Structures are given as structure tokens and as C-alpha cells.
From Swiss-Prot:
Gene: atpD
Binding site for ATP: 151-158
Membership in a protein family: Belongs to the ATPase alpha/beta chains family.
Reactions mediated catalytically: ATP + H2O + 4 H(+)(in) = ADP + phosphate + 5 H(+)(out)
Source taxon at top rank: Bacteria
Protein's recorded name: ATP synthase subunit beta
GO cellular component, one term: proton-transporting ATP synthase complex
Molecular function per GO: ATP binding; ATP hydrolysis activity; proton-transporting ATP synthase activity, rotational mechanism
SUPFAM superfamilies, sorted: C-terminal domain of alpha and beta subunits of F1 ATP synthase, N-terminal domain of alpha and beta subunits of F1 ATP synthase, P-loop containing nucleoside triphosphate hydrolases
Source organism per UniProt: Jannaschia sp. (strain CCS1)
Assembly: F-type ATPases have 2 components, CF(1) - the catalytic core - and CF(0) - the membrane proton channel. CF(1) has five subunits: alpha(3), beta(3), gamma(1), delta(1), epsilon(1). CF(0) has four main subunits: a(1), b(1), b'(1) and c(9-12).
UniProt subcellular location: Cell inner membrane
Topology versus the membrane: Peripheral membrane protein
Length: 474
């Protein structure tokens, strides 16, 4: 049967109504039309009755006119998948946007897939070492798990994601997929060129590249921003299922997925729920997050940046995301104001792996001791602010001194932030991190100045920096 053809009856921004006289397209079907000489994809969102469907445009709808013909593709939006996508940048409908010619892919997949059956999912717990001290020590990431990076505007989510790509994608033998959801075009461009510089993308021999990129940037219509995460996820699922690989799936930023869903929901005339979000917020998030999982064939480890509106973690968007995560890394403005980067909050960040049966007794105990000292310091800060340090007991003075050293020791220079710090990035082995913090907690380095602990790797560098500071002072 020939694909059904309909006519546009109404255009309101990103929402386009199309009337079909015979065969009505199903919900989530992709429709195609010509706009300004380019293919425009519309996704069916509602059946309005009398042969009319309401659709969401995946690109700008400027230039569309009533009466224009639209063809039903008889299936969902599809994207190219497989090795041909490596080193390429695709948009939401799988078209290349890197001016590198057509994508050499043998297979296309629909972006709406069912999550794997429960019986097929893997439940093993294994630590994914990142080389970032504060993460590995206090809120370790799980291989095949979901990790959230929470933070307000400008506290370093994208820098942390780029460092994780740098640290893990380089040493990681599998492939990675990066979904840029509603973020800055400049950051997307910077990321692409950084990938080329670091050898993760090989422009002269694309099959050797280790990452595929899908972008739906801030300036794109809400339909594209809402579906781009699913396009990226479809690529990641194919790598996992076809090759049995361990896939890294980066999303920057998952909040924009929710935000775009909220815009689309309002355009479709749904009654908003709390704080103006769409009534289907939990369903939209759950449908996507359930697909990001590890099966017995391979794993998808997902690292998601989550923008926190007005630094309010109780906002429905970040709160809904929390429920799906194995580990949360919370970035704090108060810590970034102290100049400590990565600005990870050691007391707010958590991980399901922080269990002695998984990480071992020594790691668990050191992490709890570090958090205990930092928590005591936090509770003493009001007293210090009002009465000053002199009013504290000797024991509390020692706790404060150690806490300030620990706080600075949790900072670390990043490869991707070399432009800002002027020093090369350092990755620290997990064993070194544990032994270093164990010694600091035990008071073995109480004699060293706290400045020596700032922006260094292991404890050997602290000692070297302290000696240099002493020599400079003399």
C-alpha cells in the first residue's frame, strides 16, 4: 500500500496539524514534508478526530503553509546505527551536521524502542574508576549504572563530563555516545575539536574513532530537544546489542529533555502540573531511563548532567531524575566560590556502591571518616563565624585544620581545564586515593600547610609542593 498523504491545516509554532482523508498515521509515526528544499520531519503526538493529527516539528516550521502535502512514513523516526556513525555528528533525525557527507550505515533503527526484559538485565555491581579523587573515594560510579551530575548554572557540569570522557573514553576499550540535549552550540563545537585533539575522533580514519555525537542544541525547536536523547540512546543500544560492548552514554543536559517536554506539552494544550511541568514528567523520564540498562550481552554506563534550576534540588525535574540513579555527584556553588574544583559536594553526593561488601572495608571506612570530619567542620562553621577559632577546643581546632586540608585535597587539576589552571591534568589511582586520605585522616600530615593540598594529585605531590613552598618562603 502506498504511504498515506495528508495536507497541513494549521501551523502554530512547532505544532503542525495535518488532515488525512483515508489512512490515519499512528501516534509517534514520522511524517515527512518539504520545507525550503529540505526534508522536514513531523512526529504524530495526538489524534484530534475527523482525520486530523497534531504533530511536533523536528526542525523550524517557518515557511510551512496550509494545504501543503505531508507523507506518512508508516513508522517512527529512524536514525542510522552501527560503526558508520563513529566520529560523526548527527541531528535528531539522523542527518549528519558535520559537513562530512552521508553516513555510511547499513542499518537504521526507530528511536522508540522497548526497554530490555527484566530477565535479560544484568545486576552485577562493579566500580568504574574515573581517576577523579572525590568521585572515586566518596561516591564511586558503577559500571553499567546511571550517574547524575547535579548543579546550577556555571558550577562545572560540562567540564566534569568532558573530563570523564577524556579519562574513561581514552582508557575504555568500548565506544561512547554523546547526546548534546539543548546545550550551548559553542560547547558542542569545543567538544568536537577536543575529541579530535585527544585522538578519540580520527577524522582521517573515522572507523577508528571511539565516539558518536548527536546534537540537539539550545536554538533548535522543542521537538528536536525532546527526542535527541532517544536518538543517542538508540545508537548506544545498537552498540551494546550488536557487539556486546560496554558503552558509555553521556547526556548533557537531561534537564533540557524535561524542559523541552514541558514546552511541547504546553503547545499540545495539556494542563501543566507542579511548577508548570508536563503532567507526564515521571512517565517521560521513566520511559527513557528504563532503556539505559545493562543486559547479559553488554552494558550501557550513562553519565547525565542535570541542571538544577535556581540551585533547588527539590524542583520536580531534578527530583524525578534522582529516583533513577545509582550514583549522584552534586556540584555546589559554595565550594566553587572557594575556588575548589571539581566543586563536588562531599556530603551531598552519594552512591549505591558505597557498601563494604562492594568497595571493601578499608575504602568504606576511609570514606566515612572523611565525611565525618567534613560534617563536624560544617557544624562548627556557625560558631567560628560568630566567636572565632580561638573559642574552639583543641580537639575541634585539629578537626577544622584537617577538614580544610581534606577539602583542598579533594580538588584536582583536569586535562580539559588546562586553559584555566595552567597545569596538566592528573588521574589518581584508586589505591593511592584511599591510602592518601587514610593518612590525612590519621593526622600523619598535620605538619604540612593546607595550601600544599590544593590542586594536586597524590600525597607525594603534596609533600613536594610543601617543600617547594618552604624553600620559596626561605
Amino acid at each position: 500500500m502506498a504511504n498515506a498523504v495528508g495536507k497541513i491545516t494549521q501551523v502554530i509554532g512547532a505544532v503542525v496539524d495535518v488532515q488525512f482523508n483515508d489512512h490515519l498515521p499512528e501516534i509517534l509515526n514520522a511524517l515527512e514534508t518539504e520545507n525550503d528544499g529540505k526534508r522536514l520531519v513531523l512526529e504524530v503526538a495526538q489524534h484530534l478526530g475527523e482525520g486530523t493529527v497534531r504533530t511536533i516539528a523536528m526542525d523550524s516550521s517557518e515557511g510551512l503553509v496550509r494545504g501543503q502535502e505531508v507523507t506518512d512514513t508508516d513508522g517512527p523516526i529512524t536514525v542510522p546505527v552501527g560503526p558508520g556513525t563513529l566520529g560523526r555528528i548527527l541531528n535528531v533525525v539522523g542527518e549528519p551536521v558535520d559537513e562530512g557527507g552521508p553516513v555510511d550505515a547499513e542499518e537504521r533503527r526507530g528511536i522508540h524502542q522497548d526497554a530490555p526484559e527484566f530477565a535479560d538485565q544484568s545486576t552485577e555491581a562493579e566500580v568504574l574508576v574515573t581517576g577523579i579523587k572525590v568521585v572515586d573515594l566518596l561516591a564511586p560510579y558503577s559500571k553499567g549504572g546511571k550517574i547524575g551530575l547535579f548543579g546550577g548554572a556555571g558550577v562545572g557540569k560540562t567540564v566534569l563530563i568532558m573530563e570523564l570522557i577524556n579519562n574513561i573514553a581514552k582508557v575504555h576499550s568500548g565506544v561512547s555516545v554523546f547526546a548534546g540535549v539543548g546545550e550551548r552550540t559553542r560547547e558542542g563545537n569545543d567538544l568536537y575539536h577536543e575529541m579530535i585533539e585527544s585522538g578519540v575522533i580520527v577524522p582521517d580514519n573515522l572507523p577508528e574513532s571511539k565516539i558518536a555525537l548527536v546534537y540537539g542544541q539550545m536554538n533548535e525547536p522543542p521537538g528536536a530537544r525532546m527526542r535527541i536523547a532517544l536518538s543517542g540512546l538508540t545508537l548506544a543500544e545498537q552498540f551494546r546489542d550488536a557487539t556486546g560492548a560496554d558503552v558509555l552514554f553521556f547526556i548533557d543536559n537531561i534537564f533540557r529533555f524535561t524542559q523541552a517536554g514541558s514546552e511541547v506539552s504546553a503547545l499540545l494544550g495539556r494542563i501543566p502540573s507542579a511548577v508548570g511541568y508536563q503532567p507526564t514528567l515521571a512517565t517521560d523520564m521513566g520511559t527513557m531511563q528504563e532503556r539505559i540498562t545493562s543486559t547479559k550481552r553488554g552494558s550501557i554506563t550513562s553519565i547525565q548532567a542535570v541542571y538544577v534550576p535556581a540551585d533547588d534540588l527539590t524542583d520536580p525535574a531534578p527530583a524525578t531524575t534522582f529516583a533513577h540513579l545509582d550514583a549522584t555527584t552534586v556540584l555546589s556553588r559554595a565550594i566553587s566560590e572557594l575556588g575548589i574544583y571539581p566543586a563536588v559536594d562531599p556530603l551531598d553526593s552519594s552512591s549505591r556502591l558505597m557498601d563494604p561488601t562492594i568497595v571493601g572495608d578499608e575504602h568504606y571506612q576511609v570514606a566515612r571518616d572523611v565525611q565525618g570530619i567534613l560534617q563536624r567542620y560544617k557544624s562548627l562553621q556557625d560558631i567560628i563565624a560568630i566567636l572565632g577559632m580561638d573559642e574552639l577546643s583543641e580537639e575541634d581546632k585539629l578537626t577544622v585544620a584537617r577538614a580544610r586540608k581534606i577539602q583542598r585535597f579533594l580538588s584536582q587539576p583536569f586535562d580539559v581545564a588546562k586553559v584555566f589552571t595552567g597545569s596538566d591534568g592528573i588521574q589518581v589511582q584508586l589505591e593511592d586515593t584511599i591510602s592518601s586520605f587514610k593518612a590525612v585522616v590519621a593526622g600523619e600530615y598535620d605538619h604540612l600547610p593546607e595550601g600544599a593540598f590544593y590542586m594536586v594529585g597524590g600525597i607525594d605531590e603534596v609533600i613536594a609542593k610543601a617543600e617547594k613552598m618552604a624553600a620559596d618562603a626561605a
